[in-house]
Amino acid sequence: YVSSANQYSATEDYPYYYNGNFEPYRGRTVHKYLTEKDTVDVAYMKMMQNSTFSMLAKEALAVMLHLLDSNNAIHAHAKGLKRWDFHYDANSLNPVRFDKWFTAFHQMLWDEIYTQQDQVALPNPDVWVTVNFIEKNPYSKFYDIKSTVKIETLSDLINQSFRQISDDTISPLAEEKNAQILHLTRLDAFSKLDINVGGTKHSLNAMQQKFGPSWRMIVALGDTPE
């Protein structure tokens, strides 16, 4: 099969400069679904295109949940995330739990970058860079928060960021997202608001608050294409 899902356009040895924003998780999710089957039909392709599975959440939580201390591990947020199937379903609390925790952790890990952005044009490290970093670098000087006396570790940041969101009230994903299809005039009366829908920018059903798939198409080849 041949697939494309906004992933990187070339390998690391490509000799020329190019730029753009690339999505590292949707392409891998397509490969996941297609390699699980020897043959696929239209129904399977429909299911795949509507999938809310997040490979980002699966890979990040494999590290983050493992390093939670005993007190945090028994919190309702942690228990919910341990049972989660990593799908961003509309009525689920766990996608919101994960997003809040990962955002807090990302800001805590790269705090020196965030605090310098008013003076220097520094981009935020991509989420895949962050996940790859914590998978391969359990010990690094980047985990230390320079503004504190203590020398923090990866475990410290994961537990501190979890405690930071542990008292947050968690709403179902659709309520938290408040998905909207806005009219060109941006007038609410002409728009569709408060859509009860799942998905995330890193899943194949990449529905966000105001952006998402506008149409889907499946073509079945054969003697009578449809």
How would you label these PLM feature ranges?
Residues 1-74, 79, 83-226:
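C-terminal/peripheral segments of proteins
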